[in-house]
Amino acid sequence: MLGLIVALWATPVTWGAAAATSATFLAISIPLAIIAALMSKMMNIQTSTIPKLKCFDEHVELKLADGTKKTISQIDLGDILEDGATVVSKMRLNADNVQMYNLHGIIVSGTHVVKYQGKWIKMAVHPAATKVPYAKPYIYCLNTTSKRLMINGLTFTDWDEIYEGTLSDILSLEIKNERIGLDIKIEKEENIHKHLETGFSGNTPIELENGKTVCICDVNVGDKLKNGDEVYGLVDVDVLGMNQIYRRRLGDLQYIYGGINLCFGVDPDLTLVITAERYNGNVTKLYHLLTNSGKVCVKNVEFYDYNSGVDLFL
């Protein structure tokens, strides 16, 4: 709970949620940051290093609203699918050691959730799914405004994998903060992208283990980051439909640009003052990473990876 409170206070969109579990920002944010940093060091708290990939083979076809079809690897941000949902983010992921299944010609990972006889189940336990050998390097997934993927008459969850109880939790979120004029109610699936989407501008610097620094848009699957984490997935995010892009100041005249819901932990030396302001410049696409630790370091500040945008609210 302590780590969650710190993470929620660390980004503007989650201050309302943080208020539900803590008294006031000025009274507790700095003490909590110090305590969280000390506890992390003493207890060696880590997130899971075993990602659960919910993805499809590159040749799985999706029907668009205009009746044409595209393979999932060819889908573009902004494409409108047959159910009227818009594609708002796209993932390409490492397929190493992922068990894939064939369900009526759809090649999909065993951890992906599909609706069967009115219930949501993992692909691995679907009675008609069969294991298949798989040697391709990458698998793919999407997020959509409906939070569903309709493929050949079957209904799958999208990457966020929220349904039933978890979907209700997200749709019931109310986020208010008078300091920056936030008064948000999620209520509808399409508002998840609008208010909770996360990502960095393409020129955000990422330090690699080999000493090189590259823009986040040039990071590759399998790259090792400065802290030793491995990138197992790349995420492209459509800015269209998002609530706002923010500019964040990290320390002395260091700026990064991204969505309102960038979630970060405690600064390692507790010396950086991180501020955020609305940015009206030309940012048309965001990028994020998926790592085996669930974290990404930018300019010596540790952020949570793409999954945090929704997961921190569940």
What are these regions (language model features)?
Residues M1-I45:
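Small-residue-rich hydrophobic membrane-insertion segments
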Residues A19, A23, G67-S73, Y134, ...:
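Extracytoplasmic/periplasmic, Sec-exported soluble proteins
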Residues S29-L77, L154, I162-K224:
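Protein maturation boundaries and topogenic segments
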Residues D57-D66, L81-S172, K176, D183, ...:
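Long beta-strand-rich cores associated with HINT superfamily self-processing modules
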